[in-house]
Curated annotation (Swiss-Prot):
Protein name: 3-isopropylmalate dehydratase small subunit
Metabolic or biological pathway, per its Swiss-Prot or TrEMBL entry: Amino-acid biosynthesis; L-leucine biosynthesis; L-leucine from 3-methyl-2-oxobutanoate: step 2/4
SUPFAM superfamilies assigned: LeuD/IlvD-like
Organism: Staphylococcus aureus (strain NCTC 8325 / PS 47)
Source species, domain of life: Bacteria
Length: 190
């Protein structure tokens, strides 16, 4: 009973953005938080870096460079997603097209928001991230917890609960529904 698209193996194009301490306000500025649905935030992801004052694309911002167009794996620095606990940041990155974010570390709340929105946050050492950033595409194998370039494989850790949710495409509601018969049995006993 998958409620979100499961993630098992994923091959995608990368874009490096090696800034440390990218906070949720840099990911999605608060001025754009007026929507109540999860969609429509992609055009505002990294708004202040992505666009020049006249509204045109900033050619120096990596995700705007031609070689990174269509990237679905973001490789970034340490402490990604720090700052306020806005889930809109995860929504913006997902709507932009990212499925996987590889960083040195994540804010705990942002990490959880990624997994709740079917994005895989992966923690890797700087040397591994620098190696992976040399390639156009890399492959992630969630069941085996590896990230691979054509010539090297890196292991990553993930809590079994988050892994189970992502591999099986389960959101919180789908997990609750797994216990529906027990819930009904309990309700009848009242």
């Amino acid at each position: 009973m998958a409620a979100i698209k499961p993630i098992t193996t994923y091959k995608g194009k990368i874009v490096p953005l090696f800034n440390d301490n990218i906070d949720t306000d840099q990911i999605i500025p608060k001025v754009h938080l007026k929507r109540i649905s999860k969609s429509g935030f992609g055009p505002f992801a990294f708004d202040e870096w992505r666009y020049l004052p006249d509204g045109s694309d900033n050619p120096d911002f990596n995700p705007n460079k031609p070689q990174y167009k269509g990237a679905s794996i973001l490789i970034t620095g340490d402490n990604f997603g720090c700052g306020s606990s806005r889930e809109h940041a995860a929504w913006a990155l997902k709507d932009y097209g990212f499925h996987i974010i590889i960083a040195g570390s994540f804010s705990d709340i942002f990490y959880m928001n990624c997994t709740k929105n079917a994005m895989l946050p992966i923690v890797l050492e700087k040397s591994a991230r620098e190696h992976l950033a040399q390639y156009v595409e890399i492959e992630v194998d969630l069941p085996n917890q590896t990230v691979s370039s054509p010539d090297k494989r890196f292991h990553f850790e993930i809590d079994e609960t988050w892994k189970n949710k992502l591999v099986n495409g389960l959101d919180d509601i789908a997990i609750t529904l797994q216990y529906e018969s027990l819930i009904e049995k309990y309700e009848k006993s009242l």
